[in-house]
Amino acid sequence: MTACVSFETDPAKIPDPVKPRELATEPVVARPATSTTTGTTTSTTTDSAPQTAVIATHSGRASEQGAESPNPVRTPAQVTRVGGDTKAQIEIRDGEFRFGPSRIESPLPAGYPEPTPPGAIDLKKYPAVRRAEYASSGSPGIGMSMGFFPLFNHIKRNDIAMTSPVEMDYRGLFDPATGVQAKQDSMSWTMSFLYRTSALAPVGKDGSVVVTDRPALEVLSIGMNGAYGTGVVEKGLGLLHGWLAEHPNYEIAGEPRAFHYNGPYIANRVKWSEVQLPVRLKL
């Protein structure tokens, strides 16, 4: 049997959250005709010279028109459903990934696989990604607040649009054999904001924030609903370890991480996250 978990997805029972549109952008000069396609913007000039269509790949700059809402895409080549709720399916509606009342309002990094719906278990292949990291030790619950503002100020200073998810990497916090929270003091964590493309800023240090490239990797992932924190991570890891026990041809290849897709204004019951373990086939 495969590990399974159920979540409330009845929109009549869970309020459908709405994100306040607060992200300000710099003024954009109006043009007579502008059309947008997936990942590109076409505009026509109005001077006396012959009109020229200009195609520009979206850079991900916060001041660029449409920076906060590039079109989401399905990525079946990067995702394989292997357990949990095998019938759960996400949809793309109104420019957002959705599952029941849960939604993802911000764009994913370019090339990232689609999100795993709550209750489903997927094998997923992630490309390399450039990210801004804030690392510390101690309580990751406190760290989620402590790390957010240095990271937010970093992307604000560099005019980089917010993406989703916010990533939490955990070291020494969970028993590698069971996924249960370990009873020890030597725990540390890293919170990361992910760049949509690596062209946005170079690697290096910006105060307490480090910009670095994370290599490509394969993970076993379960989608979750619920308040963000170590409790939902522990629950998800227990289910992933259950799947691994039934599939001994895979082994754990790294520390666990969590993807947080929503901001604090979203009701806890419909917050969308993923709990992931890097894995590989045994030789």
Positions of the model-derived regions?
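A solvent-exposed interaction/effector surface
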Residues: 2-283
